[in-house]
Structures are given as structure tokens and as C-alpha cells.
């Protein structure tokens, strides 16, 4: 066949498009991906027929599917579908705007060439949805926004005496505009158009207009343009140097006899949000969940927003400062981002330098803009990512990872995980069951193997040893912590020894305790811990731990509890899948009754239900995956938000929240996979939060896909993963748009933008040189002097009891119980399989 990459790429469109047709034929309504694939695939087939022009196909693409054939929110979320194909006269782009624009569409076009039966229209009843239930719905406050407030303004009369149109952007020094414009140039010295940032005014040939001018902010130092008034603003220059330059350059000028003060410019909030994203007081619905966030603060300046593009703000002499060395300016600015983090839900520009977040606030050009945050200058050395209408979170940490196969890391990155902590050496039985990289030999191999993978890695050594020699060896070989697992014997002496060594080396201990109660009950384990800090894995117990009451550790200040995601949240199918998972990952045999009893003892509906409640109250502080050993690495984030959505449904708003303002709950849940695991494992000084001084590991989401599908992953300030279209296409948005590795994922770049987390002892023994690694090696720190009180939004320590016969769980005397969910958000609406 000798196919080109662009042809094999399009086979993805055909495969999913055909699958979507089959699903539609049997009466299933389509989700977003299926809808795009079906229309794209059919367009390709019509192109292949060679009987339609580009213009005809742009119209035909609207006449396939109707609103009744797709899920709620799909029509509003698909603004454009673009494909490229080979016409008789070459390869051309077909753009279909608003492809779902009728109720019924035309299924004859949707099924053309498929030979599938066309289903009756009666199978798809139309159901229009209220606007506030749409995916990612936005509710703006009512009062207008005043831009460029408290600045001097006047009305200026302008005429285009030229023979071609002239368009002037918001932050262009109006004095410097095209010589064919005739107006009072001396009057305009130090002023720009009083219009929303990034917009423009167009002057057609011969047209006269009166526009409002507003004085520049900042230091009023001008550069660029036509060079008429370069330098600091000086009123004395208006009638001297500036006038001379205008006359010398032949710039159109006419004295304006009457000068009127201009009114303050106001913007409708919906219009503002469409341009710059939501601002203070606006509310956003997250995906299809009944979770709403309200913007708490906007650090940008109304009228001075950074906006990139043709004729917009970030140009030389406008929002981009002139004459700066690269060390004076940002490497990257993310403009108008809505940040969702444990420390707030707010709007800001994010500045990145050398892969580190160096500023969160207002970026731009302090020479000509008000409110620019120190250290956030945009210059000609600055790259831009438009954050408008996107949500940004810190990269997720999954701190319960079995390193069974390299393919896990691709799935992790694609889902929004940027840091993994765990152990293993591949699909060995020990690694299938436990997160232990057990020796110096394997530690070196795994650190080397992941040296070019665009994730931050931490490796835990095996902590199951009543002696100390092997524990010291593995920590000094690069382990950032120890894992104590019952499959290797989680006895009191083992726990005590591991914690003693951890205290000595300042690393964390992750505990999977004794389901068998072989050496004692949970009380024996707590006695062995002796009040020292420990990370309790899958604290509910289905993943392992003292049966049936390991969950009581949630009451202790020194225990940092986490959940793994197979039980997140409790659903009608949760228990039925667990037995087979347990048998496989813990090397059990269904023919041995004791193995069956062991597995059964870990599966309890009562404690799984209680886990939902304790996650929601903040008594369980973290969520991780336990990937390929019962959990799913690509669903850490998704299952966290499903839990949050379920618990709002059953428990209502948290204290301090409202039905349409869930900021406290959102901060609680985002902390579970960002800041809290970072604190637990001694990494929060560099990762786990959107904060100055932290690595720029950032995840970009649309509101309608929040928690399900990231748009882009930034790794150490470099784009490592993104939704990207056909590489041969004329523009990057041509189908198939799928998640793909970007330049930051290339091996040499990955080593530059990522960290390997190790012990300080290993650095003292020159690990980097011994292992010849390229990644930045950082020591974990402050793993031992922390406790539950340090868990952000998740520091509750209720008095816990578990009935050993009924398994009922009480926290502070209150039964922790919710029914299993039979339907959850972030499910079929978002995923093809």
C-alpha cells in the first residue's frame, strides 16, 4: 500500500466514523468525538467521490446530524469541523461551521456509502436544554466592566485620506499611525484608542470617524511605530520635537478646534468573557458535573489585558516591551488564565522563565501599561500561550504507581499527570503486586530508563526488611522513599525499621498494611508506627490493609491517608470487578480457598461507601491510581472529580459553598492529586501547585472537558502533549485532532524539563555522575516533620470506629454511608470506549 503518514492518520477518522455510524444505526446518540468523526469521515468520502466542490461540502457538512442525534452539549461544543482531502484539482481545506445547526439533520448524508439501515427519527426524541445546564456553562455577573478606568480621555476626529483601508489596534500609539490618516497628531501624543484590548478600529478610504482616545498607562516610554515620539513622554516635546517629526515625515495633521472629554468605556460582561475569559464574580460549570466555580479575583487590568494575534496587544511598542535583554523578560507568558488550585480560583497571567513559574499576576509592558507585576515583562524573547477561556491546574501527581510497562507513562501524561512516584522493574510478579524498585542495580536501570521520559519520577525502594543494610543501600542508590507491602510481610518490626531509616534519611514510607492481621490488628501497626509520619496507601482497604478497619487510621495526626482510584467513587459495578483484579495482581489462585477468603476480606461495600464520605470531609487527603495493580493511571483526575460530583449530589454543598458556588469543594479535591501528595513526598517546594518558584508543570482544560480531556500539557515550561491535527494540513486544527506528544516529549527535551526525585544521601554520593543521567536530580525534603495538619483542605481527623461484624464505619459518631452511584458524570459523554 505504501501509505503516507497523513493517510494512516485519516484511517483513525474512518474507523471511529464507521463505529459512530454503527452506534447511531442502533439508536445510540453520539458524543462529541463520535460526532466529529462521523461528519469528518463522511466529508472525506464525499471528497473521494469527486463530485462536490469545497463550497458545496462546507454546506453539506451541516446537513448530516441534528441535535436529536447527539448528546447534550455537543452542538454547543463543536464550533468548527475541518478536514483536508484530495480533490480532482489538488488537496484543499473544507471548513464546516456550526455543523449541528438543525434538529433533524439528514441521515441519508450521515449514512451515505455505509450500507447500514437508517434508523427512524422516532428513536431520537429532541430535547432542548436550558443554557445553564450546558457543559462548561458560564454565568456572568450583571454589572458592566469599565476599561481603562480613571484615565484622561478625549474625542478625536479622524479621516482616512488614503485609497486603502487602515486598521489601528488598541495599544498602538495613535500619533504614529499611517500618514494617510488626518487628525490632530499633536493632541494624540501619549494616547491610544479607548477600545477593548486586542480590538481595532478600521478606517475605510475617505471615511471620517470620531474615536475616543485614552492616555497610556505605565511609565509612558514609547518605542516602535513610525518613530515620531520615541522615548519618555514629555509635555514640552509636543510642540517642538514631535511637531517637527510629524511635519518632516509628511504625516497627515489637522488641528482640532474643539476637544471634548470622552466617556468611560464599558463592556458587557458576556462580551468581555468571550474575549478574555471569565472575571471576578463570574461562575463556570465544570464539564457535565453539578460543580460550579466562581472567579475569586482577577489580577489582570481591565483594558490592559495581554492579547496575542494580528493587530492585537502583544506587539512591539505596545504590550511587548522594546529593547530588553532576554534575561529581563519572560520566556513564556500564559495570558488571561483561569487558575484552579488549592490556594485559590482566580484569573491571572502566568510568567515562566527557565521552566519555572516566576510570576502570577499581570504581564505586559510596564513602559506603556498599568499594573504590570514585577518580573513579568513581555519582550521580543517571550513566547505566548493564549489562556483565555481555559482553566489551568497544576500537573497531577500519581504517587502509587507500579512501573509495570513504559506505556503507562504515555497514558499518564495524556491525562494530566506530570509526576509519578512508585516502584517496579517491569511486569515481574513482584512489581505487578508492589511498588518496589528493590536494589541498586534496578534503581540504576529504572532511573536510566526514564531519563528521557517527560515526567518527574520518584522511585521507592523495598522497605520490608527487619534489618537496615538493604534499606540504606537502596536509599543511597536513589530511592526517594520506602514501600512496606504486605506481600513482602508488613510486620510491626518491618514497619518500625523502615520508619527509623526514613527518619534518618528524610524520606517517606508508603504503607500497604497486613490484610491478614497475621502479626496483629490495626492497633499493632499503629503501635509500631509510634506516632511517626507515614503515608497510608488505599486507606479504605479494598486495595489492601488491615481487614476490616484500616480506615480508622484517618483519625491520627501522623498518618497521611490516600485512596486508590478503583473504588473512586463507589458505584454499582465497583464491587463486582474487584475479585478478579485482586486475584491477578496479588498472584492468588482461585483454586485455593484461603486465597479466595483473603480476597473477599478486602471487598466491603460499607467501607467503600465510607471512603466516599471521608474523601468529601477531607479525612482522606489524597487520591492515586495503583495502576495496573487494580487502579487506572489515566483516571486519577477523572475519578477524583467523579467523586466530588457524586458527593455534592448526595451531601449537598460544603460549608461555605452554595448550590452554584463549589469553590471549597473544588479546592479540596484538586488538592488531593496536586499539593497534598507533593507535601507528603517532600516535593512541594518545586511541584504540586501553581505558585511562583515551582516548575511550570501545568495542565490546560476547556471548561466543558474539565477533568476528562486536557487540551495541552506544559512540562517544565515546554509543551509536551497537546491536541493536534493532521501534520500535513495547512493549519493545525484539521481532523483527526488527537492527543499527541509534542517537542517537550522528545528525549533530549524531556531530560531538560523534568526531574528525578531522589534522596539527599544519593546526591551526596554523586548519583548523577555515577548513573550518567541527564535529568535534573532533586532531593526530597521535609518528609518527616509533617502531619495531617499540613494537608491542604484535607486535614480532618474525626474519631473513627468500625464495627467488626457489620463493617459499619462511624466518624465522630456519625455513620459514613452513601449508596452506590448508578450514573456518573465524565463517563459516556466523553469517552469512545
UniProtKB/Swiss-Prot annotation:
Pathway: Nitrogen metabolism; urea degradation; CO(2) and NH(3) from urea (urease route): step 1/1. GO terms for biological process: urea catabolic process. One of its GO terms (molecular function) is nickel cation binding. Its EC number is 3.5.1.5. Keywords: Hydrolase, Metal-binding, Nickel, Virulence. GO terms for cellular component: urease complex. Binds 2 Ni(2+) ions per subunit. The active site is at residue 586. Its cofactor is Ni(2+). The modification N6-carboxylysine is found at residue 483. It is an enzyme of class 3 (hydrolase). Urea binds at residues 402, 433, 485, 512, 629. The urease accessory proteins URE4, URE6 and URE7 are required for urease activity, URE7 supplying nickel for the functional urease. Ni(2+) 2 binds at residues 483, 512, 538. It catalyses: urea + 2 H2O + H(+) = hydrogencarbonate + 2 NH4(+). Carboxylation allows a single lysine to coordinate two nickel ions. PANTHER family: UREASE. In the C-terminal section; belongs to the metallo-dependent hydrolases superfamily. Urease alpha subunit family. Homohexamer. Plays a nutritional role via nitrogen acquisition in the environment. Contributes to the central nervous system invasion by enhancing yeast sequestration within microcapillary beds (such as within the brain) during hematogenous spread, thereby facilitating blood-to-brain invasion by C.neoformans. Affects fitness within the mammalian phagosome, promoting non-lytic exocytosis while delaying intracellular replication and thus reducing phagolysosomal membrane damage, events that could facilitate cryptococcal dissemination when transported inside macrophages. NCBIfam families: PRK13192.1, PRK13207.1, urease_alph, urease_beta, urease_gam. This is Urease. It comes from Cryptococcus neoformans var. neoformans serotype D (strain JEC21 / ATCC MYA-565).
Amino acid at each position: 500500500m505504501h501509505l503516507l503518514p497523513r493517510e494512516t492518520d485519516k484511517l483513525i477518522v474512518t474507523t471511529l466514523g464507521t463505529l459512530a455510524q454503527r452506534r447511531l444505526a442502533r439508536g445510540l446518540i453520539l458524543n462529541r468525538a463520535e460526532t466529529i468523526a462521523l461528519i469528518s469521515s463522511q466529508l472525506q468520502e464525499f471528497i473521494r467521490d469527486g463530485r462536490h466542490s469545497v463550497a458545496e461540502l462546507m454546506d453539506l457538512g451541516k446537513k448530516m446530524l441534528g441535535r436529536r442525534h447527539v448528546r447534550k452539549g455537543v452542538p454547543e461544543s463543536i464550533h468548527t469541523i475541518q478536514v483536508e482531502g484530495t480533490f480532482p484539482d489538488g488537496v484543499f481545506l473544507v471548513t464546516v461551521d456550526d455543523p449541528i445547526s438543525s434538529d433533524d439533520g439528514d441521515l441519508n448524508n450521515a449514512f451515505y456509502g455505509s450500507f447500514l439501515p437508517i434508523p427512524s427519527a422516532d428513536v431520537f426524541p429532541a430535547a432542548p436544554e436550558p443554557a445553564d445546564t450546558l457543559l462548561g456553562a458560564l454565568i456572568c455577573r450583571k454589572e458592566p466592566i469599565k476599561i481603562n478606568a480613571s484615565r484622561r480621555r478625549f474625542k478625536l476626529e479622524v479621516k482616512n485620506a488614503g485609497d486603502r483601508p487602515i486598521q489601528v489596534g488598541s495599544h498602538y500609539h495613535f500619533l504614529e499611525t499611517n500618514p494617510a490618516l488626518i487628525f490632530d497628531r499633536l493632541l494624540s501624543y501619549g494616547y491610544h484608542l479607548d477600545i477593548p484590548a486586542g480590538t481595532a478600529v478600521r478606517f475605510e478610504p475617505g471615511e471620517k470617524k470620531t474615536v475616543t482616545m485614552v492616555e497610556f498607562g505605565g511609565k509612558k516610554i514609547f518605542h516602535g511605530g513610525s518613530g515620531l515620539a520615541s522615548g519618555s513622554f514629555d509635555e514640552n516635546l509636543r510642540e517642538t520635537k514631535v511637531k517637527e517629526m510629524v511635519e518632516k515625515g509628511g504625516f497627515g495633521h489637522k488641528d482640532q478646534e474643539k476637544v471634548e472629554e470622552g466617556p468611560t468605556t464599558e463592556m458587557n460582561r458576556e462580551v468581555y468573557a468571550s474575549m478574555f475569559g471569565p472575571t471576578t464574580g463570574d461562575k463556570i460549570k465544570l464539564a457535565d458535573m453539578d460543580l460550579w466555580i466562581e472567579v475569586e479575583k482577577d489580577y489582570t487590568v481591565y483594558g490592559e489585558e495581554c492579547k496575542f494575534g494580528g493587530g492585537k496587544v502583544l506587539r512591539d511598542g505596545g504590550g511587548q516591551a522594546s529593547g530588553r535583554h532576554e534575561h529581563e523578560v519572560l520566556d513564556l507568558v500564559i495570558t488571561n488564565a483561569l487558575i484552579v488550585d488549592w490556594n485559590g480560583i482566580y484569573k491571572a497571567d502566568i510568567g515562566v522563565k527557565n521552566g519555572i513559574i516566576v510570576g502570577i499576576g499581570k504581564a505586559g509592558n510596564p513602559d506603556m501599561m498599568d499594573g504590570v507585576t514585577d518580573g513579568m515583562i513581555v519582550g521580543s524573547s517571550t513566547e505566548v500561550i493564549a489562556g483565555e477561556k481555559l482553566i489551568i491546574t497544576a500537573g497531577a501527581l500519581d504517587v502509587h504507581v507500579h512501573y509495570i510497562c513504559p506505556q503507562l507513562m504515555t497514558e499518564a501524561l495524556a491525562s494530566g499527570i506530570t509526576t509519578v512516584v512508585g516502584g517496579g522493574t517491569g511486569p515481574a510478579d513482584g512489581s505487578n503486586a508492589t511498588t518496589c524498585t528493590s536494589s541498586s542495580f534496578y534503581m540504576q536501570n529504572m532511573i536510566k530508563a526514564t531519563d528521557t521520559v517527560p515526567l518527574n519520577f520518584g522511585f521507592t525502594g523495598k522497605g520490608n526488611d527487619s534489618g537496615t543494610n538493604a534499606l540504606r543501600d537502596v536509599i543511597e542508590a536513589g530511592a526517594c522513599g520506602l514501600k512496606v507491602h504486605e506481600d513482602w510481610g508488613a510486620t510491626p518490626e518491618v514497619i518500625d525499621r523502615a520508619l527509623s531509616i526514613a527518619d534518618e534519611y528524610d524520606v517517606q514510607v508508603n504503607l500497604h498494611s497486613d490484610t491478614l492481621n497475621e502479626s496483629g490488628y490495626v492497633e499493632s501497626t499503629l503501635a509500631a508506627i509510634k506516632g511517626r509520619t507515614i503515608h497510608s496507601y488505599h486507606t479504605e482497604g479494598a486495595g489492601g490493609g488491615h481487614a476490616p478497619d484500616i480506615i480508622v487510621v484517618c483519625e491520627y495526626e501522623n498518618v497521611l491517608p490516600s485512596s486508590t482510584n478503583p473504588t473512586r467513587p463507589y458505584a454499582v459495578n465497583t464491587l463486582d470487578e474487584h475479585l478478579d483484579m485482586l486475584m491477578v495482581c496479588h498472584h492468588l489462585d482461585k483454586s485455593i480457598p484461603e486465597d479466595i477468603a483473603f480476597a473477599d476480606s478486602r471487598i466491603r461495600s460499607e467501607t467503600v461507601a465510607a471512603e466516599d464520605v471521608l474523601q468529601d470531609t477531607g479525612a482522606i487527603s489524597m487520591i492515586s491510581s495503583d495502576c495496573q495493580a487494580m487502579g487506572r493511571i489515566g483516571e486519577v483526575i477523572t475519578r477524583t472529580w467523579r467523586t466530588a460530583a457524586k458527593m455534592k449530589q448526595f451531601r449537598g454543598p460544603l460549608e461555605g459553598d452554595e448550590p452554584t458556588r463549589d469553590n471549597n469543594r473544588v479546592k479540596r479535591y484538586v488538592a488531593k492529586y496536586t499539593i497534598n501528595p507533593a507535601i507528603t513526598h517532600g516535593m512541594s517546594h518545586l511541584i504540586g501547585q501553581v505558585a511562583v518558584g515551582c516548575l511550570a508543570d501545568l495542565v490546560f482544560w476547556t471548561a466543558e472537558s474539565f477533568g476528562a480531556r486536557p487540551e495541552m500539557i506544559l512540562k517544565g515550561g515546554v509543551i509536551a502533549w497537546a491536541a493536534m491535527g493532521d501534520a500535513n494540513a495547512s493549519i493545525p486544527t484539521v481532523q483527526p485532532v488527537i492527543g499527541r506528544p509534542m517537542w517537550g516529549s522528545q528525549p533530549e527535551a524531556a531530560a531538560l524539563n523534568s526531574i528525578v526525585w531522589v534522596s539527599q544521601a544519593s546526591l551526596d554520593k554523586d548519583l548523577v555522575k555515577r548513573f550518567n543521567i541527564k535529568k535534573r536530580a532533586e532531593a526530597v525534603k521535609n518528609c518527616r516533620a509533617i502531619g495531617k495538619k499540613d494537608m491542604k483542605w484535607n486535614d480532618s481527623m474525626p474519631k473513627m470506629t468500625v464495627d467488626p461484624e457489620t463493617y459499619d464505619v462511624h466518624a465522630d459518631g456519625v455513620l459514613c454511608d452513601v449508596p452506590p452511584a448508578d450514573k456518573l458524570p465524565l463517563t459516556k459523554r466523553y469517552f469512545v470506549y
